[in-house]
Design a protein with these regions (language model features):
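Short hydrophobic alpha-helical runs that function as membrane-insertion/retention elements
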Residues: 91-94, 111-112
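Acidic, PIN/NYN-like endoribonuclease modules and their adjacent C-terminal/linker elements
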Residues: 41-42, 100-162
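Active-site-proximal, substrate-binding regions of enzyme catalytic domains
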Residues: 1-90, 97, 105, 154
Length: 162
């Protein structure tokens, strides 16, 4: 089971790889705040995201999300997924450093998109070569990734292919 945030959904939608989430997790959950954040007409990947949400359980935003957002200095959508993951003791898939830092203070285990790619390559969902191509595509489409992290992930993916 996984709770997904827009920071992971959007880049995966840009490169047509939302299926990596459903291939890795049996149950996918998020909040209305996140759904509304990503379903924006005229934006790249919106149609793919809309179809993806057919298989996602979308929960109401937790009552205390606004208070947590205010106290932690994060967006309400970010607080909503942290609280949802915390409540169900679930993994949070996100790609936002600030959100991940706050989530960890709440005891929530977090994966980044790069972690998902590594998991998919290890399990054979994609080959290591395909995962490297996806990594390149993500960065090429605008996903922020430090060059050092890119090099480390690319190296690990290459080792999986050996």
């Amino acid at each position: 089971m996984v709770v997904v945030d827009s920071s992971a959904l959007i880049p995966l939608a840009w490169v047509g790889r939302l299926g990596l989430i459903s291939a890795t997790f049996d149950e996918i959950r998020t909040t209305k705040e996140v759904r509304e954040e990503v379903l924006v007409e005229g934006k790249l990947g919106t149609a793919a995201l809309d179809a993806f949400f057919d298989a996602v359980t979308v929960h109401e935003t937790p009552d205390d999300a606004e208070q947590v957002a205010s106290m932690e200095g994060i967006a309400v959508a970010d607080a909503s997924v942290i609280l949802l993951a915390e409540d169900g003791e679930e993994l949070l898939l996100a790609n936002d450093r600030g959100l991940i830092e706050v989530a960890r203070t709440h005891g929530v285990e977090c994966w980044r998109v790069t972690t998902l790619l590594l998991k998919c390559a290890k399990e054979g969902t994609v080959t290591s070569e395909e995962a490297i191509d996806v990594l390149y595509d993500l960065v090429d489409e605008g996903m922020n990734l430090h060059p050092k992290v890119y090099a480390q992930v690319q190296k690990k993916l290459g080792e999986l292919g050996d």
